[in-house]
């Protein structure tokens, strides 16, 4: 099936909005004197490669979106990354910006200490239509809390306030002017389920968490936005019982009404949450090859057709 013929409409939902819970104070709001990204490793491999992957991972991973956001009003690109101390002993959530007028970067602000050295807890960033800078602080699984923080003043990184604490992984917040955030993320509940929440324009009231897909042993997903109108999500699946390092197939869904309904490009309405690996969202079947599928990006062409960047592999 060509990518230009994939769409997903998912059943409309209405959930009651609830205000953010009061969050525990963990903010630091201190300026650092330079840039130190977190170094991280994962899963000793017992061979010449030593680890499954390792290195400087301050902007890890591909499923954390976005790490940077351009503001036309200030001519700055605001960005975040996973920082650390001189001993690489903890993960700081850092925010700064590049000023395109002066060609200089600001000294970064340390928003909070995540109290881990796991780069899966790296933050992502976005700006709302009033210029407030938002930081979504991830967690690797459910053992640690996740946070949502907002700048005290528009376009300013000096001070952030904690808006919410709870739990989410692989955060992908997209802001729709006049509507609010459509927040795509993973929630570890006996696996890796695909979820979403939406907010009011101010980002202070959110819907309850909504499950989009959860079958076999879960998924990794990557979302993208077209023209401020449409959100698309590409994801794979972990076949049941085969372990984390086995992932296959490509699925895709999109919404053009702020997450109320989701469709295939062909207009097929999906029964959400998706609960079977055989469903209309399936784009390519690779389980029988067998091949691992690593989804790396979801974009759109000028006409709004989805483009999915992925890697095929015989192993990990």
Residue ranges with predicted function:
Residues 1-3:
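N-terminal secretory signal peptides that target proteins for export/translocation
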Residues 17, 21-25:
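Boundary at the C-terminal end of the N-terminal hydrophobic targeting segment
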């Amino acid at each position: 099936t060509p990518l230009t013929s994939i769409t997903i409409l998912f059943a409309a939902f209405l959930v009651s909005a609830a205000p953010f819970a009061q969050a525990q104070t963990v903010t630091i709001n201190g300026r650092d004197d330079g840039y130190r990204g977190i170094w991280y490793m994962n899963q000793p491999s017992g061979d010449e490669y030593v680890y499954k992957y390792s290195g400087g991972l301050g902007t890890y991973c591909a499923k954390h979106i976005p790490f940077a956001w351009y503001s036309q009003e200030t001519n700055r690109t605001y960005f975040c990354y996973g920082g650390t101390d001189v001993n690489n002993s903890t993960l700081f959530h850092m925010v700064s910006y590049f000023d395109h007028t002066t060609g200089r970067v600001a000294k970064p602000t340390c928003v909070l200490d995540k109290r881990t050295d796991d780069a899966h807890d790296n933050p992502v960033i976005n700006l709302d239509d009033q210029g407030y800078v938002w930081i979504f602080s991830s967690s690797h699984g459910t053992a640690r809390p996740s946070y949502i923080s907002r700048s005290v003043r528009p376009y300013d990184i000096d001070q952030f306030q904690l808006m919410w604490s709870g739990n989410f992984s692989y955060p992908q917040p997209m802001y729709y002017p006049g509507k609010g955030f459509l927040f795509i993320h993973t929630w570890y509940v006996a696996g890796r389920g695909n979820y979403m929440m939406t907010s009011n324009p101010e980002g202070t009231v959110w819907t309850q968490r909504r499950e989009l897909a959860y079958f076999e042993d879960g998924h990794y997903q990557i979302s993208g936005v077209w023209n401020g109108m449409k959100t698309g999500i590409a994801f794979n699946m972990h076949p049941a019982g085969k372990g984390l390092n086995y992932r296959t197939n490509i699925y895709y869904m999109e919404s053009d009404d702020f997450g109320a309904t989701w469709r295939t490009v062909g207009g097929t309405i999906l029964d959400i949450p998706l609960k079977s690996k055989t469903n209309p969202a399936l784009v390519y079947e690779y389980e029988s090859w067998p091949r691992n599928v690593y989804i790396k990006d979801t974009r759109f062409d000028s006409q709004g057709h989805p483009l999915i960047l992925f890697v095929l592999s015989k192993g990990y």
